[in-house]
């Protein structure tokens, strides 16, 4: 593949944080360390997941604000497509009403994505994209693709990052299957 083994493990670790799977987090942390990742790279990876976890509710605030305005004006809220629209007006409205919280978010956003132990290309274009897909945020996906192109990401790297996200999402289900089967066993033993 086009992405190094270490970077794949770091992308997987970011995705593990997005799925909130403690087993996946432990496993991917060990695999990332074994692939040569440093503690600093792992810490930056967690911050990328945190940033994208913020991204979905941030972008979706546009839906809430648009609906608020439409409902206050007694307009229909069932027409149009939220995912293809330009959310800039509602995001600006959100910024205006957020006070100093938006300034703090902006500082966090810039710090998370600046070059550090991990490259902007990995953080914005690949790790960010994988997390955005798991956050199911169309606008986050769009911005990660835009940023990734600016950082030189190629389509093969994007598809590898997406595949990592898919595997990690399924991995969270697999890792928690034991809980399900434990409940099944307990329930069946009570009925016998």
What are these regions (language model features)?
Residues 1-192:
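Hydrophobic alpha-helical segments
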């Amino acid at each position: 593949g086009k992405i190094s083994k270490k970077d794949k493990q770091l992308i997987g670790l970011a995705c593990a944080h997005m799925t909130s799977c403690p087993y996946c987090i432990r496993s991917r942390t060990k695999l990332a360390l074994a692939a040569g990742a440093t503690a600093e790279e792992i810490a930056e990876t967690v911050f990328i997941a945190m940033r994208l976890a913020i991204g979905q509710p941030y972008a979706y605030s546009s839906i809430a604000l648009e609906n608020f305005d439409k409902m206050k004006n007694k307009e229909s809220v069932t027409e149009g497509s939220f995912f293809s629209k330009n959310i800039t007006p509602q995001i600006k409205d959100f910024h205006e009403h957020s006070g100093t919280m938006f300034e703090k978010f902006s500082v966090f956003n810039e710090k998370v994505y600046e070059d550090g132990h991990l490259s902007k290309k990995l953080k914005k274009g690949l790790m960010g994209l994988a997390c955005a897909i798991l956050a199911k945020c169309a606008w986050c996906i769009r911005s990660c693709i835009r940023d990734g192109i600016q950082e030189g990401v190629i389509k093969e790297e994007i598809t590898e990052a997406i595949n990592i996200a898919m595997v990690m999402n399924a991995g969270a289900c697999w890792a928690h299957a034991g809980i399900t089967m434990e409940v099944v066993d307990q329930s069946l033993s009570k009925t016998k």
